[in-house]
């Protein structure tokens, strides 16, 4: 089975290819998708998948990720990509100055669409916002700590076992194995 992962982020496509290996061949296309605004990452991913399928007319996967910082009432939430581009990790750390509660949740919505069926999956991990550590990964990985290590300090294999995206992609994998084989 061949599925197109529509994302501008090559790291995400590689992560998906690794998790879905042996079940689906992942093709990466960085199709420009209009920015969607919904309350949940699953809704945004589903909207992106519907759009991507309408353009490409082949099975697609899309995703959307949110970072929900508890001390900041869930900010940046579903606007995580925009916030990363504009104020970055240093901006988040500045906003959190003076807050003792450093807890946060990373959540990813993964959506599959093949023209006949659309299905969404979510994955979430809880962690802590810390000063940047590590040099692998991307985005918020250097400041998001889980069990004493930031996502940027983990190997790709370690991250693929526990990340929010990996959890959603593993749910997609189980569903594809049951429904599409």
Language model regions located:
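Anionic-ligand binding patches
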Residues: 1-4, 11-181
């Amino acid at each position: 089975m061949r599925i197109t992962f529509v994302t501008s982020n090559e790291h995400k496509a590689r992560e998906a290819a690794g998790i879905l290996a042996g079940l689906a061949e992942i093709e990466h296309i960085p199709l420009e998708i209009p920015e969607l605004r919904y309350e949940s990452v699953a809704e945004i991913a589903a909207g992106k998948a519907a759009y991507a399928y309408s353009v490409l007319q082949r099975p697609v996967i899309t995703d959307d990720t949110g970072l929900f910082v508890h001390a900041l009432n869930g900010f940046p939430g579903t606007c995580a990509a925009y916030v990363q581009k504009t104020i970055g990790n240093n901006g988040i750390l500045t906003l959190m100055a003076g807050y003792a509660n450093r807890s946060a949740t990373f959540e990813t919505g993964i959506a599959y669409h093949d023209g006949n069926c659309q299905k969404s999956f979510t994955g979430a991990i809880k962690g802590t916002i810390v000063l940047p550590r590590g040099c692998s990964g991307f985005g918020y990985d250097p400041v998001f700590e889980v069990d004493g290590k930031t996502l940027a300090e983990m190997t790709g294999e370690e991250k693929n076992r526990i990340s929010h995206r990996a959890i959603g992609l593993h749910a997609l994998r189980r569903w594809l194995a049951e429904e599409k084989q």
